[in-house]
From Swiss-Prot:
PANTHER family: TRNA N6-ADENOSINE THREONYLCARBAMOYLTRANSFERASE, TRNA N6-ADENOSINE THREONYLCARBAMOYLTRANSFERASE, MITOCHONDRIAL. Fe cation binds at H117, H121, D306. Belongs to the KAE1 / TsaD family. Keywords: Acyltransferase, Cytoplasm, Iron, Metal-binding, Transferase, tRNA processing. Pfam families: TsaD. Required for the formation of a threonylcarbamoyl group on adenosine at position 37 (t(6)A37) in tRNAs that read codons beginning with adenine. Is involved in the transfer of the threonylcarbamoyl moiety of threonylcarbamoyl-AMP (TC-AMP) to the N6 group of A37, together with TsaE and TsaB. TsaD likely plays a direct catalytic role in this reaction. This is tRNA N6-adenosine threonylcarbamoyltransferase. Substrate binds at V140, V141, S142, G143, G144, D173, G186, N278. The gene is tsaD. GO terms for biological process: tRNA threonylcarbamoyladenosine modification.
Amino acid sequence: MKGLSEGLILGIESSCDETAAAVVAGGRRVLSNTVASQVDLFRKYGGVVPEIASRRHLELILPVIREALQMAGVTLEQIDAVAVTHGPGLVGTLLVGLSAAKALAFGLDKPLIGVNHLQGHIYANFLVEPPPEFPLVCLVVSGGHTDLIYMAGHGRMELLGRTLDDAAGEAFDKVARSVGLGYPGGPQVEKLARSGDPEAVPLPRAHTEGPYDFSFSGLKTAVLQYVQRTGPLNDQQRADLAASFQRAVTSVLVERTVKAAEAKGVRQVILAGGVAANGALREEMRAALEPRGIRLGYPPPVLCTDNAAMIAAAGYYLWRAGVRHDLDLNAVPGLGLGIGG
């Protein structure tokens, strides 16, 4: 079953509150994708507690890796390389996955490949059919990042714009808390917004100096002020506010992405990151792109949230390009999307 020419990559992900391992063949075929989520654990806290998350990763990392290998029907000896998230993320949780990956790479004499978590989200798009076609514009939108990227090919990236303050996903979480919704906030806001009027509450859209940059702090503040000014909200007011907020976010994301796609002359746009699972964003983006003859791609929701299949996919293309990392590879909590890789 091995197929040496395919390249079997074991991916490991532990950047936040998901302990994940996966085996991917040839950067495209998911043989297994095991995720142990801590969402239920942190729901009572309203967010991730780093120390608790790290301890839970320690308990889960080896069983999750074993399960991924068993589900894939492969042994450690058949793996060609070990790919692991080394940033960005929480330093304590990153170290758990990184330490496990180093131990495996050293013990098996296999290449170690450090993967940028954000690149992992991008490469989740290469695990679906049809795969994206270069050149393309990618919108990475998650709890910690909102980036607009031009990709001419594998490893050939240009950062076009990013958020100047809050990430879109962070704004979703904070607004969710302000209207009494649970954690994680994004899916809760999206669900509530379905029964609301997106035009009911006038909310600002930030204008940034950079044509492809984003800013959501003013929008978040406007929502908080509306809640304080209005007082206790009834169910319909909460739904209207959720819908109006969601529309304010998605309209800006769509407008900047379309502008970038037209400026770069691409025929392909892809979405990546947790917020890429948002149905309203997908629908509005598709409605804006299709009349322009631009294709829209995105992963299924299970590959939008943190997982190790995306890390293995990104790791495959790095492995194929000859990238190898030493065992002194560090966890980098604030790792950015490096231009060109």
